[in-house]
């Protein structure tokens, strides 16, 4: 169980959650989280069951709800709720496949200070996506690796959607022991993500890709530069 609060250059945040790898003693992974900041509320519930029905497959499901209120600063507000269900299994040695079905309902509202492009996107959206990931993992340890590497490719494909965007993400990491006596490990990583509209229209603001905050140094969250 975790509970945290903080104040910084990006504003104040309070949050908490429960993370358990053996929930009820049944090997169930449970991850719940709630985060409240000055302009957003984010909540999620993730349940995963390794070796589901003795098949060596991991079954996972999640429920999420977010509110991003930028009416005072950028003229828009986004409210999102959704759920997903999927599985992950080892297709070949060190190669994992993780298909997922994701449904999201979104409401986008604007005010007079919003840009013309945001005003054009105002409305309600229903998105039904098929997402999948390919993971090639040769790390010697998933928690604190000292050698090997991991390659991850994720793609999000619209099945039924008000807008049609495809998102591709690639993550690569490589680990190498630099000094065994001092337990010094070197890491090199690469992150690439792109969202493209199938009909050439502007990508919806909630679908636009951003660099994850934990991969940036020297920047304020939600700012440019």
Predicted features, each with a name:
Residues 1-152, 182, 212-225:
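Gram-negative/organellar outer-membrane beta-barrel architecture
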Residues 98, 142-144, 161-163, 198-199:
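Short helix/loop capping segments that flank catalytic or ligand/cofactor-binding pockets
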Residues 81-84, 149-159, 164-198:
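Transmembrane beta-barrel strand/turn architecture of Gram-negative outer membrane proteins
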Residues 179-225:
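Extracytoplasmic gating/loop element in the C-terminal half of outer-membrane beta-barrel translocons
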Residues 48-51, 170-171, 202, 206:
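Charged/polar, low-hydrophobicity segments characteristic of intrinsically disordered regions
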